[in-house]
């Protein structure tokens, strides 16, 4: 990576170099995208056509407008083609901005104007990539939790994208079923989990908790006795959930089911928030078919360079004037979908 960065700093920026840097240096791969959304389908059109995705000939979305924060389903409709919201985070290349120090970076290099400019561009791209990846992960999490989410974007009125999750797959503990009201020394929540899992359209092999949900689950003596924290007996699952960063913790196997705790966060209006609400439990399968689809890049420069169907289009350009200014931007039109939203069961613990 050090040689790559050195060569990158010594050369001028081309789209190919920006794409390579974005892929190698700024890859952002949160839990839900990595585990459940492994297929990618960039389209050459602004619209995503579900019938063109292998195995989704009959899939449709129910799209409803959102007015003053309220979903108006009476004005919505079912469709097999949809134009995703367009996102394009943009930054100015400002020589005065504060830079994050890279590991092993010589601080003397930052005094070199050319080096500093290139480092600023790289830092801008990292922030832009994280902004887009945050949108993708939020869509993915909401698709798994609710089977639907709100789509927003540049010059795009908010709409609700509904994949048709069965109501029985969104469960809220109530009426005496709350785990918080159970005797932690005698109650065994295994039967509850097995009952919830029956609502899934396939086999459940993973449960994802938020930290508070995990604390509630682990408070039962029966859980602590049954949880197998040894490694090696389920290598495929362990491989799928390892090396996911500090926001993910693999807790062990509960029977044939992997237990994972996710504390990933996003930033909204400068405030950090958790992707998973408090006391959330998600039952799913690591082979569920999540789809990363993308509308085409709507940029004349991209078309001229032959870049149309792509998840990302990074660019770096200058504007003439007094003074001239320089900018960076990454463009994308993401739409995260589940081929079968009923492969997941979402439980709000209480």
Predicted ranges, named:
Residues 39-107:
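Assembly/oligomerization interface modules of large self-assembling protein complexes
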Residues 179-207, 211-220, 224-228, 234-245:
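Acidic/histidine-enriched, beta-strand-rich ligand/metal-binding domains
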Residues 87-166, 188-192, 196-213, 324-330:
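Long, contiguous amphipathic alpha-helices that act as assembly "spine/axial" helices in icosahedral shell
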